[in-house]
Amino acid sequence: MTSSRKVRPTKHIFVTGGVVSSLGKGLTAASLGQLLIARGLSVTMQKLDPYLNVDPGTMNPFEHGEVFVTEDGAETDLDLGHYERFLDRNLGLNANVTTGKVYSTVIAKERRGEYLGKTVQVIPHITDEIKARILSMGEPDAHGNAPDVVISEVGGTVGDIESQPFLEAARQVRHEIGRENCFFIHCSLVPYLATSGELKTKPTQHSVAELRGIGILPDALVLRCDREVPQGLKDKIAMMCDVDYEGVVSCPDSSSIYNIPDVLYREHLDTFIIRRLGLPFRDVDWSTWHDLLERVNNPRHELTVGIVGKYIDLPDAYLSVVEAVRAAGYANWTRTNIKWITSDDCETPSGAMKALSGLDAIVVPGGFGIRGIEGKIGAITFAREHKIPLLGLCLGLQCTVIEAARQAGLEQASSTEFDPAATQPVIATMEEQKAAVSGEADLGGTMRLGAYPATLEEGSLVAELYGTTEVSERHRHRYEVNNAYRAQIAEGSDLVFSGTSPDGHLVEFVEYPKEVHPYLVATQAHPEYKSRPTHAHPLFYGLVKTALELRVHP
């Protein structure tokens, strides 16, 4: 059956950045996507990353931040999390393109002889591969529907050597599909000098000059600053950078990232783009988003949620966890203040008491390696004994099981990840992961990745939270609960194994009954990846809701 939608060319919007990194290109792109969706357009997004890694899966969290996992099991840049949350749609493997992926594909083609003996070069072979991946995002889906708009964020900063092939590919895309079907947005810093009390435009002028030097004239500029950029300076930048006055947009720092679409709307960026690209549109329907902003900016309650992690020196390592906690807060009209707690501080009862006292709820997120594990277990013990609501994620479930096993008399309970010679390995390496763990197979892209189904026990707390006994969550792990110890742990502690894989083999959820603890739930999955600011994830929602109830009825 063919689609009834009118056939029109997909429009491509490229978002670049200049002057400095971490300007918020991803948030700008995601906010624009949300704004265009509110205009009735279908939008998809893509991140072009210039690093040589095939994906960020093997990168240090301190170096890269969070690895965001998609439904189809791709390990991707954290910006894809922003895209999914703002667009409220799932993205896949093709939404993250890295230099490593591109070169791997091109070299594999060369080895197969697909270039017919030609000298393989950055131009045209690398740029052609990048172009193909960009244009593929605009192809029709299984139902014959193509997106109206593809927004591609080019990682890095204009002027970086690594970014040049991607920028050249974007330039060629504009040439091939027509200027009327392509739009370039450049994000730039407008610094404020306190000594002179002035905003400086020169960095932006030089950044645009650098971009023009490689053949790209931006259609719009998003000016990042710690304050509003006055109209006079915007007009000056428009003149000096040869950009339409309407295309120069001020985007000052905001108290919440979810205010950014409204900022861009008030600057009329969407109107300018729609007119330039000849897109159909309707009046903005922001009923859902404005309800979110009301909850973000006018909360009725306030809670403090502790995140007990190993990588807290770089909060971006837990970006989706933080946003999932905040989304649960919004759903409960609550401002959730995040307190970062290094797991090492919770190794002793006195350390846990000092670090965790006064918290309304605790999240124990994922991680790898032995450092800080006893602290995570100590935090779980403290939460269990003091009836503090706690949610464990991935490694958080494994630590919850180890803590329960020690209650059940398995005093040496541990994981083969931390101690390959453990005498009571209540957490063990998954059979299909043993080659990777032993070094006989690649580490990259070989974990249990992506969405997997689970069956929940009828009448369990997790089944009540989800409202069903059949669920699907995203995963990223190599280790699992050792089934040889399940019965002993269940008999010797109050822990309930409340959800498993459909075949009953893999433990996916554990919990304590409500009469034992108000809310101590853990999952082998990463539910934070499926949370949306407008649709809080059930497990995070339950955590915040229980914490609020305990505030009222301790």
Swiss-Prot record:
Catalytic activity from the UniProt record: UTP + L-glutamine + ATP + H2O = CTP + L-glutamate + ADP + phosphate + 2 H(+); L-glutamine + H2O = L-glutamate + NH4(+); UTP + NH4(+) + ATP = CTP + ADP + phosphate + 2 H(+)
Active site: 394, 526, 528
Annotated positions binding CTP: 21, 160-162, 200-205, 236
Domain of life: Bacteria
Pfam families xrefs: CTP_synth_N (PF06418), GATase (PF00117)
Gene Ontology CC terms, in alphabetical order: cytosol
Keyword Ligase assigned: yes
Enzyme superclass (EC): ligase
Binding site for Mg(2+): 79, 153
Cystine connections: none
GO molecular function: ATP binding; CTP synthase activity; glutaminase activity; identical protein binding; metal ion binding
Pathway, per record: Pyrimidine metabolism; CTP biosynthesis via de novo pathway; CTP from UDP: step 2/2
Regulation: Allosterically activated by GTP, when glutamine is the substrate; GTP has no effect on the reaction when ammonia is the substrate. The allosteric effector GTP functions by stabilizing the protein conformation that binds the tetrahedral intermediate(s) formed during glutamine hydrolysis. Inhibited by the product CTP, via allosteric rather than competitive inhibition.
Gene3D superfamilies with a match to the protein in the record: 3.40.50.880, P-loop containing nucleotide triphosphate hydrolases
Record: residues binding UTP: 21, 200-205, 236
Other noteworthy facts: CTPSs have evolved a hybrid strategy for distinguishing between UTP and CTP. The overlapping regions of the product feedback inhibitory and substrate sites recognize a common feature in both compounds, the triphosphate moiety. To differentiate isosteric substrate and product pyrimidine rings, an additional pocket far from the expected kinase/ligase catalytic site, specifically recognizes the cytosine and ribose portions of the product inhibitor.
Subunit structure: Homotetramer.
NCBIfam families according to UniProt: PRK05380.1 (NF003792), PyrG (TIGR00337)
Protein name: CTP synthase
Source organism: Corynebacterium glutamicum (strain ATCC 13032 / DSM 20300 / JCM 1318 / BCRC 11384 / CCUG 27702 / LMG 3730 / NBRC 12168 / NCIMB 10025 / NRRL B-2784 / 534)
High-level lineage: Bacteria, Bacillati, Actinomycetota, Actinomycetes, Mycobacteriales
